[in-house]
Amino acid sequence: MAVVTLKQLLEAGVHFGHQTRRWNPKMKPFIYAERNGIYIIDLQKTYEQLEAAYSFVRDASKEGKTVLFVGTKRQAQEPIREEAERAGMPYVNQRWIGGFLTNFRTIRTRIKKYKELLALREQGYIESLDYKEQKRVMRELEKLDKYYSGVKDMDTLPDILFVVDTKKEEAAIREAKKIGIPVVAMIDTNCDPDLVDYPIPANDDAVRAIKLITSKIADAILEGREGRQGIVSSEGQQASMEEIAEELEAIDETEKYLDLIDEEKEEE
């Protein structure tokens, strides 16, 4: 049984790469063709790479390991939060804080401070302060909430990073590699697959594509921890890229930009 079908990948727009002038040659093995100025990702390769990543994450989850979800670009913020929360995992969906992994001792003190302020607010203590002090504390709490709400229960370094857009999250990946944390990531045609341990070739700009891939990583965690399988029917999984090629013939460059992305594709 498959964790996803080629039809699902196609319908989510996972196959849309970047314009041909914006590509990384290392992505060539994952590219099926060029259509009207954009590269088309080979969904068979996406299928295979996602299966490998799914198995890796599922097995890690069986051992009680933690996956940190990372995606700070506009299109990724909600899928990252929703799927990480569904899987009971920490997440970063705002700005990546430098040293989050490599200087986690300091980060942990900030998380502790954040939790202390949350407790004080819950107890009504902040409301008892004078107006000026109350405003100062609330500003501090709002700032901490923005950057640390997704990791407030994370007491130790994560075992795995799941990342959307390796170019955007270059700092996070660099820190993970420095301390030996394996990385699973969605990689578009402008990315370097060699930077991650489990690359998943996919359109990392469309909300639907991000949601689909991220949900499968969450499914893998739940299956590993609870035996809750996130598999789908095997119907359609044997379809090849050649068999769905006719779906790609009429592709227009604007489809990646307008049909599948809520707002115009972010420039590098």
Swiss-Prot record:
Gene Ontology biological-process entries: translation
Superkingdom assignment: Bacteria
GO CC terms, sorted: cytosolic small ribosomal subunit
Pfam family, one: Ribosomal_S2
SUPFAM superfamilies named among the record's database cross-references: Ribosomal protein S2 (SSF52313)
A GO MF term: structural constituent of ribosome
Keywords: Ribonucleoprotein, Ribosomal protein
Keyword Ribosomal protein in annotation: yes
NCBIfam families per the UniProt record, alphabetical: rpsB_bact
Similarity field: Belongs to the universal ribosomal protein uS2 family.
PANTHER family: 30S RIBOSOMAL PROTEIN S2 PROKARYOTIC AND ORGANELLAR (PTHR12534), SMALL RIBOSOMAL SUBUNIT PROTEIN US2M (PTHR12534:SF0)
Name listed for the protein in its UniProt record: Small ribosomal subunit protein uS2
The organism's taxonomic lineage, starting at the top: Bacteria, Pseudomonadati, Coprothermobacterota, Coprothermobacteria, Coprothermobacterales
